[in-house]
Amino acid sequence: REVAGLPEARGDGAAQASSWLDRVFNVQSLQRALRRMRPKGHAAGIDGWLGVLLRWAPLHVQQQYVMMVRRAAELLQFPPIWSVNLVTHIPKPGKSVSRVEKMRDLWNCPHGWKICTQMMREEYNRVGDRCIPGCQRGFRACCDAAEAAATATFQTEEATTLCVPLGRLYLDLSGFFMGVVRRLLYEIEGELGVDTRLTSCVRAVHEVMSGRADTAYGLSECWPV
């Protein structure tokens, strides 16, 4: 609990989880999320904690973690450190390293929040599978780049056949990218039928989100994101 910063899980009847908590936060969804946690290739967040440690932990520890995440989601009281992103700047080829705006910025969130969003991702995928038409492809499960190229070709032929302009809008919001306007994100989720309590969990962390840059002189001060 000291590492994760999660609230104490309660075992009394008054704290019995509701159906949406049962559906989203359970041991099975946690273990599926932990499969993405690997020893290498995952930079630690600002707290330095590696999610793969929870993957290696015994079952009773994972069960306790799930209970604490459920409690945090129920109260909308997530660890404050989950809202702080570690920012690393990587030079681009041929660009000056003295101009920070010319560098690529990599945002690393704490692994606790990463695991939590991976558990919530299944609910977002459920809504996406219901709303996205079967003819639309792209980077979706069981769909490859060839299908995406074929879809674009068919749309071009459709416009040519009809002799009219044809517009298609694609929004990729699945990765919680920093460039996504949050107000737009919340509105889209509401229109598509995402559980508002799930959106509230994401919003609770996003509303107080900040960043700290890793520099040659140590970590910078926090700035709001």
Question: What are these model-predicted stretches?
Answer:
Residues 3-225:
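Conserved pre-catalytic core of RNA-dependent polymerases
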